[in-house]
Amino acid sequence: MKTSDIAALEQTVEKAFENRDSVNTETRGEIREAVEAALDLLDSGGMRVAQRGEDGQWTVNQWLKKAVLLSFRLNPMQIIKGGPGDAVWWDKVSSKFDGWSSNEFEKAGFRAVPNCIVRRSAYIAPGAVLMPSFVNLGAYVGRNTMVDTWATVGSCAQIGENVHLSGGVGIGGVLEPMQAGPTIIEDNCFIGARSEVVEGCIVREGSVLGMGVFIGKSTKIVDRETGQIFYGEVPPYSVVVAGTMPGKTMANGEPGPNLYCAVIVKRVDEKTRSKTSINDLLRD
């Protein structure tokens, strides 16, 4: 699609969002066509809700998030097919695989194991593997990434290439508030089982999160070697485990309860990360 065409779509979506109270299931014409085109761009990987610049900073295409939100107003509740044993759901968002045959799957180039669920407007890159998992609308899953069993990729989340989301991992979705950025896992990261990264936090390239690490915007991420504390972002090539920090002394003079934090136990370079097993990295 030409740049001028995308700019026209953006303008239409922005205007419609400003007047969203008037958008409903009866809305036709330019607004519906623009929203559908935006969802198609997301679904095909032609555009992303956010992309990383050469300087490492992420730019969020807020108008695409607005298109996703407008689609909830445009689409009525309906039967959604594609469940195990011909089960159906009652929702406003169709399955990404609705109407797909072997031709579409072969062209897409990823593996979709039975009971994985992907909603329309999520993009799955070639080489990715989806175990029984859930990928929400507007999300992006990069090449050769594994989304393991019961992992969830939230709305508009951005998952890089060669990432492993272990069993039960939760990557939070961010549609609103509008100014908030999506949760991002950059290339070559490993997220350990049952870990959660939410609220638009970023895990930078090559990082390893051990099992059961929880990171939100208010979580202290403490570098054990330097004492530096980060919020909302794990630095590149960090090895992170769950930990605690001493709490404040209570009014009665007794030590307060320790509070949860994430601990950077070491940092490695790209060469070491590529040659060292995950278990070895996590051992102290």
From Swiss-Prot:
Q: List the Pfam families hit by this protein, alphabetically.
A: Hexapep_2 (PF14602), THDPS_N_2 (PF14805)
Q: What is the lineage of its organism?
A: Bacteria, Pseudomonadati, Pseudomonadota, Alphaproteobacteria, Hyphomicrobiales
Q: Give the pathway.
A: Amino-acid biosynthesis; L-lysine biosynthesis via DAP pathway; LL-2,6-diaminopimelate from (S)-tetrahydrodipicolinate (succinylase route): step 1/3
Q: What class of enzyme is it?
A: transferase
According to its UniProt record, where is this protein located?
Cytoplasm
Keywords on this record?
Acyltransferase, Amino-acid biosynthesis, Cytoplasm, Diaminopimelate biosynthesis, Lysine biosynthesis, Repeat, Transferase
Subunit note: Homotrimer.
Q: What name has this protein been given in UniProt?
A: 2,3,4,5-tetrahydropyridine-2,6-dicarboxylate N-succinyltransferase
Give the SUPFAM superfamilies listed for this entry: Trimeric LpxA-like enzymes
Binding sites annotated in the UniProt record for substrate: R111, D148
Gene for this chain: dapD
